[in-house]
């Protein structure tokens, strides 16, 4: 086993257009096959569409959407005496942000709109209004944690 410990987190640079680390993280989540300029075009286009539809700062809309999607609890598998229990645990802040961004991007890819820009923009707008598949995913995660609350004493 390695003895050096975990690798240090690399600092994220602020996004050049909006000056936000969240937008940088979103670009990195949209990124496929190393095509960063395409990912930036998709994210900036989606944020611009969100600005046109709401008339407010798109970074504020994105933050509101993330707050509605971030999970507070999740279940982790824990093996105890031959049985595997789904143990509810609290989610660290950095992981909750990562999960929220991942869910936003994945569920926007499954939407029916024509372009990825429209899909991402509409998923962000839906999430900021408390609607959409990514918010439903968060609710399902919380329901699973609540249903398995009896195993909470197995937390580690």
Swiss-Prot record:
Keywords carried by this UniProt record: Ribonucleoprotein, Ribosomal protein, RNA-binding, rRNA-binding, tRNA-binding
Example GO BP: translation
Any GO CC annotation of this UniProt entry: small ribosomal subunit
GO MF, one example: rRNA binding
Family as reported in the entry's similarity comment: Belongs to the universal ribosomal protein uS7 family.
Function: One of the primary rRNA binding proteins, it binds directly to 16S rRNA where it nucleates assembly of the head domain of the 30S subunit. Is located at the subunit interface close to the decoding center, probably blocks exit of the E-site tRNA.
Subunit organization: Part of the 30S ribosomal subunit. Contacts proteins S9 and S11.
Name of the molecule in the record: Small ribosomal subunit protein uS7
Gene field: rpsG
């Amino acid at each position: 086993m390695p003895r050096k410990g975990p690798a240090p987190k690399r600092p994220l640079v602020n996004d050049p257009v909006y000056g936000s680390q969240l937008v940088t993280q979103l670009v990195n989540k949209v990124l496929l096959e190393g095509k960063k300029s395409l990912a930036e075009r998709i994210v900036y286009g989606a944020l611009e569409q969100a600005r046109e539809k709401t008339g407010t700062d798109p970074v504020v809309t994105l933050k509101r959407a993330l707050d509605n999607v971030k999970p507070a609890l999740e279940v982790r598998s824990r093996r105890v005496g031959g049985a595997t229990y789904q143990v509810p645990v609290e989610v660290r802040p950095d992981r909750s942000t990562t999960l929220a961004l991942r869910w936003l991007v994945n569920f926007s890819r499954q939407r029916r709109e024509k372009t990825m820009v429209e899909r991402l923009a509409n998923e962000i707008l839906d999430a900021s209004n408390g609607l959409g598949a990514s918010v439903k995913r968060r609710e399902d995660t919380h329901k699973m944690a609540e249903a398995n609350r009896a195993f909470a004493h197995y937390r580690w």
